[in-house]
Amino acid sequence: MSFIAFAIFLFLTAVAGLHVAWGTGVRWPCKTETELVSTVVGHRSNKMPTPNQCYLAALAIYIPGPIALMLAGLIDASVTASTIPLAGSAAALVFLGRGIAGYLPAWRERFPREPFATYDRLYYSPLCLLLAAGFLILLINRPGT
């Protein structure tokens, strides 16, 4: 379970880092803001979210990473015994919801731009479903359960 927890942590840390970079104005992996919006945001506007929105997204993406490590018993948490599985369950549900949302027509109407729509269907949503599965595996196999 350590491998799964560490993989989740590293992946979410990297994705959170990208969101921080975008908040500071970095356009990687694209050249222009419009291209970046089309690739990673997908809404109709040509403007990236504000820096604060990028930073908030980065924080929301990062937080489940240490939770995965706690679920695997790799880091100690100074919280009640029920808090970590509750947080892990919440993370699993959020990733499951985001993963499913990417395949719904209402989501596609809200985020129709290409190549985001294709990337979302092929990569972003499946990755969210994989993260949800990882959290479920960690929850089921928690040390001491």
Where are these regions (language model features)?
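N-terminal signal-anchor transmembrane alpha helix
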Residues: 5-24
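Core segments of transmembrane alpha-helices
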Residues: 51-69, 127-132
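Alpha-helical transmembrane segments of multi-pass membrane proteins
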Residues: 15, 91-98
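Interfacial loop at the N-terminal end of multi-pass membrane proteins
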Residues: 18-56, 74-75, 109-115
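Individual transmembrane alpha-helices with interfacial aromatic-anchor signatures
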Residues: 84-90, 114-131
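Transmembrane alpha-helical segments of integral membrane proteins
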Residues: 98-112
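Feature marks short, highly hydrophobic, charge-poor N-terminal signal-anchor/signal peptide-like helices
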Residues: 1-7, 145
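Juxtamembrane boundary at the C-terminal end of a transmembrane helix
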Residues: 71, 135-145
